[in-house]
C-alpha cells in the first residue's frame, strides 16, 4: 500500500504535503484558533480539509489559499464546504494579505498546516503584513517553532527568532507526533500562535536595516560581533550601545538588535 496516498490523493513531495488525520490533534488546533462567524478567516494550504471542515462548521464564509489545483478542485465540489469557501488557487507567497484584509474590512485570522519546505520564507512574507493580521496559528516543524520562540543565549535563537518577536508575540500551543499525519513526516511538529503586537515594543526606522544586520550576524554566528559586524560597527560604537563586541549573534537580544538597526539608520554612510 502506498503511504503517500490519502483519501484518494497522492501527496506531492514538491509541495511538501503531509496530511493531518488525528482527530484529537485537529480538535485541539481548531479549539486554539476558536474561529467565530463574521471574522475574516484565511486558511493557507487546506489540503484535504482536515482543518477546513471543522472550521467550516463554525463559519458562514471564509477563504482558503491552495496551490495544488487538484486539491482546490476537490474543495470546489466538497458537499458541506463548497458554498462557504472563497478558494484562491495561488501560491501563498504571492498573496497580498493587506488587500484581503481591506476586502474583508477587518484584520485577518490566518491559520494552516504549512508545507515544511516553504514555512520559513512564508513566515517572512506574512510578517510584512502584520498590520493587516489579527493572529496566526500554524502547524510547523517543531524545530521551526523552537526557533520562533527561542530567547537569546540559546542555540535555537536566530534571525527567525528576532524577526518573529519583533513583529509578534509568539506562543507555543501543542506538540504533534509524526503519526498524526499521512504520510508521516520524519520530524516532530508543533502548533504555534503568533499575535502581532498592537504597538511594536522596539520600533526601528527601517526594517530592511534590521534584516541586514541579523542576516550578517547569524550567517557568521560563531564569530564575535567584532568580526561578524565589524564592517558596520566599531567596538566603540557597540560599547556605546551597551553591546559587548566579544559576544556572538545568539547573545544579543531583540531590543539590542533594534538599537543597532536604529543607530545604523542614523549613520547611513556606514552601510555602504
Curated annotation (Swiss-Prot):
Entries under SMART domains matching the protein: rADc
Gene: rsmA
Entries under CDD domains matching the protein: AdoMet_MTases (cd02440)
Protein source organism: Pectobacterium carotovorum subsp. carotovorum (strain PC1)
MF term (GO), any: 16S rRNA (adenine(1518)-N(6)/adenine(1519)-N(6))-dimethyltransferase activity
HAMAP family (alphabetical): 16SrRNA_methyltr_A (MF_00607)
InterPro entries: KsgA/Erm (IPR001737), rRNA_Ade_diMease-like_C (IPR023165), rRNA_Ade_Mease_Trfase_CS (IPR020596), rRNA_Ade_methylase_Trfase_N (IPR020598), rRNA_adenine_dimethylase (IPR011530), SAM-dependent_MTases_sf (IPR029063)
Keyword set, alphabetical order: Cytoplasm, Methyltransferase, RNA-binding, rRNA processing, S-adenosyl-L-methionine, Transferase
Name of the protein: Ribosomal RNA small subunit methyltransferase A
Family assignment from sequence similarity: Belongs to the class I-like SAM-binding methyltransferase superfamily. rRNA adenine N(6)-methyltransferase family. RsmA subfamily.
Record EC number: 2.1.1.182
Amino acid at each position: 500500500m502506498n503511504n503517500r496516498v490519502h483519501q484518494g490523493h497522492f501527496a506531492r513531495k514538491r509541495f511538501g504535503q503531509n496530511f493531518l488525520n488525528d482527530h484529537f490533534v485537529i480538535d485541539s488546533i481548531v479549539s486554539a484558533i476558536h474561529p467565530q462567524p463574521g471574522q475574516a478567516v484565511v486558511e493557507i494550504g487546506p489540503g484535504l480539509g482536515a482543518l477546513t471542515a471543522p472550521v467550516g462548521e463554525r463559519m458562514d464564509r471564509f477563504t482558503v489559499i491552495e496551490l495544488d489545483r487538484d486539491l482546490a478542485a476537490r474543495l470546489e465540489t466538497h458537499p458541506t464546504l463548497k458554498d462557504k469557501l472563497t478558494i484562491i488557487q495561488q501560491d501563498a507567497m504571492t498573496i497580498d494579505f493587506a488587500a484581503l484584509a481591506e476586502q474583508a474590512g477587518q484584520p485577518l485570522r490566518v491559520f494552516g498546516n504549512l508545507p515544511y519546505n516553504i514555512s520559513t520564507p512564508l513566515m517572512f512574507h506574512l510578517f510584512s503584513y502584520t498590520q493587516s493580521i489579527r493572529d496566526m496559528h500554524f502547524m510547523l516543524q517543531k524545530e521551526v517553532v523552537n526557533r520562533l520562540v527561542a530567547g537569546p543565549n540559546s542555540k535555537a535563537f536566530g534571525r527567525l527568532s528576532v524577526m518573529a518577536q519583533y513583529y509578534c508575540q509568539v506562543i507555543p500551543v501543542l506538540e504533534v507526533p509524526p503519526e498524526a499525519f499521512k504520510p508521516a513526516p520524519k520530524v516532530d511538529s508543533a502548533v504555534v500562535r503568533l499575535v502581532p503586537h498592537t504597538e511594536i515594543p522596539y520600533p526601528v526606522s527601517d526594517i530592511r536595516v534590521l534584516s541586514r544586520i541579523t542576516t550578517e550576524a547569524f550567517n557568521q554566528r560563531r564569530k564575535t560581533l567584532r568580526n561578524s559586524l565589524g564592517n558596520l560597527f566599531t567596538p566603540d560604537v557597540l560599547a556605546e550601545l551597551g553591546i559587548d563586541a566579544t559576544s556572538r549573534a545568539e547573545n544579543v537580544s531583540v531590543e539590542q538588535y533594534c538599537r543597532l538597526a536604529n543607530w545604523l539608520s542614523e549613520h547611513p554612510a556606514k552601510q555602504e
